[in-house]
Every structure is written in C-alpha cells, then in structure tokens.
C-alpha cells in the first residue's frame, strides 16, 4: 500500500487531529465516525483506527509501518514505546518537531531535495534515524534557509519537545536524547497498534 496523497481533511474528520499530516484540526463534534458494533468487530475497528492514525500522522506506507513494528518487537523494552521512539527519531519527524517544517510531508520534501544536513553532511533519506547529539541544519544558502524560515517563524516554541533544542537564528536543531513517551506529538494508544499487527500473523 502506497503513501497517502489524498485529501488531508478527509482523514482528520475520520481519525481526529493528525498534526504531522496537516495543521488543520476537525471541528469540535464534527464527523469523527463512531459506528458502534458488537464485540470483536468493534474491537477490531478501534485497533485499525489507531493503526491508521499512526500511519497517516507519520506519512508511512503500510509496509514501512509493519517493518517498524517488527523492529520494535525485537527490542527488550515495551514494543509500543520502542515503536514510537523509532518513528519520532526519523529525520522528517525531527524537522517537523523542531518547527523547521509545518508538516511531515513538507519536511520530507526538504530532505528529498537535499536542503538538510545532519552533522555537516547532506542526508536525503527522510527515514534516516537520528540519535542523541545529532545536529540538524539547513544548507548554507539563501534558498534552503528561506524554505524553513516561515515554518520557524510560525511555530510555537512552547510545543518544542524536551528532547530537542533549536537555534532559530542559525536554523540549527539538536537532538539531546531519546524522547520520553509523554513528548510524543500525537494522541495515540500504541498498544492497540501492536495488538492489531499481532493479530494479523
């Protein structure tokens, strides 16, 4: 299944706020579809919905998300927590959380078009896994800086998670450490996502 490129508002009406996909939010009490079924069907629907929220927020294909679930499942820690850490430490998501891009698709474009450096080297792979002490910057030219300027100016410094810092004048971000669960930027029950995939095998 390919990455979703359709109407974004359609997805947030069904799944709720997906800040990585779009800055728009569904109206209070709008069409967040709540069809109640009995027993197993309702439980399956809830698990599927949580999985879809995770996939669309981070802009992943079904295959990519499944691969992350498998990697997380091999860790000694909680599978759900490791899954969120893997997704949050992707370069495209780090750019989004730093405020250098307004959405994850926008961050992905910055990376694909070679505007972003990690520790002084161009990285053009959005899924690149960042680690503590990594320094993320734009290329030292006006075009690259201009592309992130508006996003930084309109971002809310109060929403910057504690595992990141940013120098807005130099367009430079720092990954201080692996994030804690409470800093994840999406309202999600990751255990239901893990359960969804465990029941598919």
UniProtKB/Swiss-Prot annotation:
Residues 20-39 are annotated as: Disordered. Coiled coil: none annotated. Pfam families: Ribosomal_S4, S4. It is found in: Plastid, Chloroplast. This is Small ribosomal subunit protein uS4c. HAMAP family: Ribosomal_uS4_B. One of its GO terms (cellular component) is plastid. InterPro entries: Ribosomal_uS4, Ribosomal_uS4_bac-type, Ribosomal_uS4_CS, Ribosomal_uS4_N, S4_RNA-bd, S4_RNA-bd_sf. One of the primary rRNA binding proteins, it binds directly to 16S rRNA where it nucleates assembly of the body of the 30S subunit. Belongs to the universal ribosomal protein uS4 family. CDD domains: S4. Residues 89-150 form the S4 RNA-binding domain. Part of the 30S ribosomal subunit. Contacts protein S5. The interaction surface between S4 and S5 is involved in control of translational fidelity.
């Amino acid at each position: 299944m390919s990455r979703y490129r359709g109407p974004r508002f359609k997805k947030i009406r069904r799944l709720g706020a997906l800040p990585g996909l779009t800055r728009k939010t569904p109206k209070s009490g709008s069409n967040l579809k709540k069809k109640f079924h009995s027993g197993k069907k309702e439980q399956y629907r809830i698990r599927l919905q949580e999985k879809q929220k995770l996939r669309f927020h981070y802009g992943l294909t079904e295959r990519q998300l499944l691969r992350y679930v498998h990697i997380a499942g091999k860790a000694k820690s909680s599978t759900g927590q490791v899954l969120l850490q893997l997704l949050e430490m992707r370069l495209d998501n780090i750019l989004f959380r730093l405020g250098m891009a307004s959405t994850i698709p926008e961050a992905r474009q910055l990376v694909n078009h070679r505007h972003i450096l990690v520790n002084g080297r161009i990285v053009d792979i959005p899924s690149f896994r960042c680690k503590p002490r990594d320094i993320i910057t734009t290329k030292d030219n006006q075009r690259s800086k201009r592309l992130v300027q508006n996003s930084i100016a309109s971002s809310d410094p109060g929403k910057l998670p504690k595992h990141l810092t940013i120098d807005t004048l130099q367009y430079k971000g720092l990954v201080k450490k692996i994030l804690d669960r409470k800093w994840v930027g999406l309202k999600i029950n990751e255990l239901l996502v893990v359960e969804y995939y465990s029941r598919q095998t």
